[in-house]
Amino acid sequence: MLGNITPVSFFKTWVLKKTDVHVMISAREVFPCFIFRVFLLFQVFSRVHTLTNHANFEFEKSLSSCDKPCYNGVCLNKACVCSKGWYGSQCDHCFGRIRISDNASYISDGPLDYSPSAKCTWLIEPENSATPLKIRINSFFTECGWDYLYIYDGDSVYGKQLAALCGEQPSQEFTAASGKALVHFFSDLAINLNGFNVSYESNRCAYNCSNHGSCLNGKCDCEDGYKGLNCEYQVCQLSGKSTESPCHEGQCVDGRCECLSARVHGETCQMPVSSSVWDLIHPTNNAPTGKASHASIAIDDVVWSIGGEFFDGSSDPNNIDVYNVTSRIWSKVEVSGDMPKPRFDHTVVKYKNKLYMFGGVTKTQVRHQTTQAATNELWIFDMGSKKWAQQIHKNETIIAAPFAVAGHSAHVIRSEMFVIFGYNPLFGFMHHVQIYNFETEEWTVANTSDHVYGRFKHSAVEYTTPTGATAILVYGGSMWNNTITDSLMQFDTSTKKWSNLPQSGVQLYLHAAAYLNGLMVVVGGRGSNVTAGSKSECFSNMVQSYDVACKQWSNMSTAPVDLKRFGHSVHVIGQKLYALGGFNGKMKSDVWTLSPAKCSSATRPDECRLITDGTKCVFVDSSCVPFDPTVSYKSSFASMIKSSTPKSFDECTNTPLRLALKTCEEQTDCVSCASKSGCGWCSSGEQCLPNEQECVDGPGMLTSWEKCPQRNSVATMRPCNMENNCGSCRISPHCTWYPIDKASPCVSKEDLSPAFFLVHSRRKGKNRDPNQYQAADMSRVPRAAAFNSLAVVYEYETKSVLADRNKFLSPSHFPSFFRNATECPMPCAQRNNCSDCTDLEQCMWCPSTNRCINLEAYTLSFAYGQCHSWVTSGSGSVINRVCQAESVVCEEHKTCGECQRDPGCGWLADDSKTGLGLCIRGTSTGPLEPKPENSTWYFIDCPACQCNGHSTCFTSVGSFPPVTIEKCQSCQNHTTGAHCERCAPGFYGDARNGGVCSPCDCHHQADMCDPVSGQCFCKTKGVTGDRCDKCEAKYVGNPRNGTPCFYELAVDFIFTFKLRSDDKDNHTSEIYLYSVPYKKDTDVTFQISCESPKGNALVALNMTSSYVNGLADKSQAMMVDTICDSKGFRRVYVASDKGYPFGPDSNTTFFVRVYNFNTPVQIVVSFAQSPPINWVLFFVIFAACFIVLLVVAGLLWMIKVRIEAYRRNQRRIDEIEHMASRPFASTKMELSMLSQFSSAGGPTPLSIEPCSNYRAGVFTLAVRLPTGGKAVTPSGTSGLAVASSLCLLTPQQVGVLQAQDNGESNSGRKSNFRNLLRLTIRQRPNNND
């Protein structure tokens, strides 16, 4: 490492390297010359030693002056100078290619977390490369599914691929039989983790053959009694029981362990029968190449494995591998006739004597490139004739089955094949259940009203329900938005209905499941993606079981670590479960078997219940037996007599969840379910569940009966917000796609307003970009109108989608459908190149597979590291350059550095020493194609300078430190840059590798253009276009002919131009204006100001005019190079001057040019024509107006006074009349002496005021005040008072007081009062009675 050398040794090393050349040359010369050169060499060494001693202190100081350590480099001038293959401020990130020739060493991404977008390649070529190479993974932790370390056996990627490691990997070893290895690391932009540390050692096999064999030609030659790739498994050879036998409690019989006791089982009789046991099966012959995502099926005691994903360099992927579990022999089926394309993520089922293979992702090799595509092909394999035949579909519409799917599951029920879910590149995650009838050869879609989400790479098993129907259990899988689910659902094949079952609590996909002893056993899988703060398992070895009868999940005994994998398959044969293949960073071909626990090992009921590993037991008749769902078990006699009420047998453990589930399942409708405490209604499956659970899909759980739908309501349509793909949204007749709403782009047509049909009719017939959404230009339209517009634009016409399926599948026919019929953007799957793919934001281009996919489908499509890099719309501003740089077509790379970032390419440089060359496929030894003459192959390093054919390399040596400097001399052909890799200012093109730089074609309207695309940076405001050949709106001119674009300034208006430092105005440095004064004999005032933080501007003003009297046109410069600042200036041009003829007859025009400014700038400019003011006339008019104003004001004031007086008098009259209309009367009172007694019998009221209801009234009476025992009241005090009281009225009083008719005079009221008084007097009681 350079970081460990001393300054002196570094200096001496450089001198020795330089002198080696002279020594080799001197060997060919005569002896005297040699002596002379030795003398000079001695003088050089002496001088070097002296310089080193003097400079040692300063050099050491410079090396130690960096703030942070330089891990893979040296510190010079307070900065780290990195060694080859490293970069970063601390030389802590790997970069480019490195060749390692040591017999034993290590490689690493760096001491810290690896960098984003890393591409690092190590070529391990030990000196002893003729012997096998052992590669050991010491530590490894990267982002699961995104950041991979690829290991190849050989000196290039064209050798056999050994691994594609990601996630968290255990310590493991590999053997490169060729003695060489190429290791390539790729990371993306998102998450950066600890990385890896890998060591290697030459002349070793992996694990040293477990010390039970010898390494021969890269393979372990095992000793007797040991097998395996690394001799890691001991097998029995000698018959009978032996101390050296691997059989723990058994003996060897015909090469296998035969257990001597019924209490143990397993491959080596190592486990008691009360527990399940996993065993690795050692096949009798060599296993085939490892693979994953294959399709397999168990027929009798044979497993057929078809297709799958393989590593590069593996055997023929079309092979059909067959494994016999009884004989433990692998074999291949010889197939004749037509062959289907290689594929993975497909399914295979058996009906009668034929195998049916449907769907998956096909792989096509075209010119060293692999193209992948999802398919809906159905192939039939005749097991008798060993021939394939493709079944041609009868449906001719793309919106009918069969849909192309991958990652689905298939099940044979009676004479039909049920295809569950899967991913379709056009419609996303399919929620449909496709049904194929073997007899009629017709495809249909199950008509179900339940609303569920589609899934990818779930697991599914079929079983027979207690009612005799066949149901399919579907567990886990990946859904839209990269969501992994732990849900379990059941599909009834008779009623075509979905129902919800308890979740497992573990999110998995790419797992496998089988039905064993009443249990759904789920093995392995891939968990959630790794994030920066968590360590979720990328490869799982978890084994779960779901009790179908009890509806309970449980975890089985811990499986071996070697079982961590995904993409495998499992089958049940002879009461055992077999797991085959899969991926855990390596493609696996091993076979594991699960031997479930045996019920007979239990003797007590409690022991019987505890046996749950791979089986389900019940204690009946004093014995523990396997549970059979078709048998009705009864309770024992002892348990019956102990209880007052006999109970039926319950084989399940009554957990709180199960009790709640049992209670809720008794409710059959929404109202009763929601009314039950602790229960909720799932409308998607019309099922009642405990509210601790969740509805699998569709709307949320209903826990209030008031929210339940009506009993007689029609089944609801699938909610539009459950569709997350434009294609799936469009095939729903009640939905439409609204891309502006990012949260829920699929909306119901019922929510749209009919107010936008007019808008659509105006748009109809206009040219539209078919690749863009039709709502992209509706930002100014109200939301309701925009909704309806999309309803019209996206109106689905069934006639438009009728097309021959073969034509539809071709790329040339597909765009017309999606552009004209559904108005959806072209799907990612139909974009066939990088630039088209990245035009759509949600698309991602994978160069290594030549495939464009949706962002949400990346981890689904490339679960095994098939994508070595990817490009999206956010990868860079010049997307074409990024696409070119990431291409796997070597010939598209233009420089040596870019070429070597692709591990499959090398640089073939010509011998002109100018940097010209060709990037082609090759290995470290040379190109794969024939090498042309006069060329040199570079696989690790690059030629000096790399001047791209525009210069030659110049070499010089620095004074101190003595570092060789190689640089390009003056670049020619209008190029610039350290390697002449860019076009010089004023030119554009691709200067790399001899490219041509052309002058910017900007019609003299720009000084510079984009050096790559040639897009002109127009310097004149108002000029636009890639070639500055058009004028913007409101500007006039013809830039093509050299005439700039002018903006007209209307007279007597102020104009403000704000030019910002953005992409639009960043290069603007001038603006042209003009104004036409239309008033004759009126002065013209020109005013302008220029405010900019980057300096002042200059102004030029010209005036042109033509005379009506026949004189020639006249043009004169009014000002030139006049400085314009923030204060501005003002000029007045007098109309009386003969040189300024204004008015329509003279056709005078002012032309203004504001130039030499830098943005941002604000320009305020105006032309004004105001006639001179006649002050006498002004004051006369002003005085007249003022007098008129006073007169009018006086008149208005007088009118106001008159009106107010009239209103005041009128109000007074009304008040007097109102007071006069009040009831009043006079009365005479006779005061008797105190000693006298009145014969009248009592007082009479002075007045009576009846209430509104005439039932009571206020009686007012005169009251004599007390005198205090004297004859009269004291002097100054009144002797009388008026008192009032509320009293009831008699009928007679009411009759007198009743209100009279309208029109009765006020005098009548007074007479009524008198009558009342007389009535009161008559009714006074007689005291004599």
UniProtKB/Swiss-Prot annotation:
Gene3D superfamilies: Kelch-type beta propeller (2.120.10.80), Laminin (2.10.25.10), Spermadhesin, CUB domain (2.60.120.290). GO terms for biological process: animal organ morphogenesis; tissue development. The keyword Lyase does not apply. Residues 94-203 form the CUB domain. Coiled coil: none annotated. Disulfide bonds join 66-75, 70-80, 82-91, 94-120, 144-166, 205-215, 209-220, 222-231, 236-252, 247-257, 259-269, 945-953, 947-968, 971-980, 983-997, 1000-1009, 1002-1016, 1018-1028, 1031-1045. Glycans are attached at residues 103, 197, 208, 324, 395, 447, 481, 529, 555, 820, 832-833, 934, 973, 1066, 1102, 1147. Residues 945-999, 1000-1047 form the Laminin EGF-like domain. The keyword Hydrolase does not apply. InterPro entries: Beta-prop_ATRN-MKLN-like, CUB_dom, EGF-like_dom, GBD_ATRN, Kelch-typ_b-propeller, LE_dom, LMN_ATRN_NET-like_EGF, LZTR1/Attractin. The chain crosses the membrane at residues 1176-1196. Residues 65-92, 204-232, 235-270, 952-998 form the EGF-like domain. It comes from the Eukaryota. It is found in: Membrane. Keywords: Disulfide bond, EGF-like domain, Glycoprotein, Kelch repeat, Laminin EGF-like domain, Membrane, Repeat, Signal, Transmembrane, Transmembrane helix. CDD domains: CUB, EGF_CA, EGF_Lam. It is a single-pass type I membrane protein. Kelch repeats lie at residues 302-353, 355-408, 416-463, 471-518, 520-575, 577-619. This is Putative protein tag-53.
